[in-house]
Amino acid sequence: MDAKIKPLRGGKPADARPEFQPAELDPSEFLAAAVQPDQPRPSRTEAEQAVKTLLAYIGENTGREGLLDTPRRVVEAYDELFQGYHQCPAEVLDRTFGETAGYDDFVLVRDIGFTSHCEHHVMPFYGKAHIAYTPVERVVGLSKLARLVEIFARRLQTQEHLTAQIAAAIDEVLKPRGVAVMIEAEHTCMSVRGIGKQGASTFTSRYTGMFRDNPAEQARFMSMIRSRG
């Protein structure tokens, strides 16, 4: 007699995959400033020399008039573009209001514009972040969510990692019932180099708590993002 294969609990087929759980991020990775004051770094002079070396590598004459100040300007631009390494996400989210006045639904801030740089080619990618969370006791000022996006965006990133870091930081500091983050962005490493396809958008999302566990809440989050009424 042929052996009978018993179905898994809940009627799932025998070859069903276990439910996926996203990897947890190490809080030390995103809750503190990435660069500490006592951390050894190259000097500004060394950084400017590195820029000069790259200019020479592509075939430029680094001594011509138009490039004399370029190394200094590039280093100053990097100081601005990557200032997120010196800023602490936890400090931004730690300034909260302790009273929700009985509010028990989620808070959504959408269309938070940002520009970041990919860690593969150090080329810009830019777009919008949409963030929702359902508070328990702590409510953060709405501008702080935009500030959080700015801090993480001003570091070398992948879009996937940026999405996960934003969600994890809110989840860890505010302890809400759930967090939803969606990012839509265009990557210049795809539009101006390589395949050279302009206008293509990449979407990433991350859900925690009630959003991860309840598809209806995910659908409502998506509906409110798309609504323009």
Swiss-Prot record:
Q: Which UniProt keywords apply?
A: GTP-binding, Hydrolase, Metal-binding, Nucleotide-binding, One-carbon metabolism, Zinc
Question: Which Cys-Cys disulfides exist here?
Answer: none
Task: Using the UniProt annotation, give all residue ranges assigned to the region (Disordered).
Answer: 1-26
Reaction(s) the record says it catalyses:
GTP + H2O = 7,8-dihydroneopterin 3'-triphosphate + formate + H(+)
EC number, as in UniProt:
3.5.4.16
- Which GO molecular-function terms appear in the entry? GTP binding; GTP cyclohydrolase I activity; zinc ion binding
Its assembly, as annotated, is: Toroid-shaped homodecamer, composed of two pentamers of five dimers.
Q: What is this protein called?
A: GTP cyclohydrolase 1
Please tell me the species this chain comes from: Rhodopseudomonas palustris (strain BisB5)
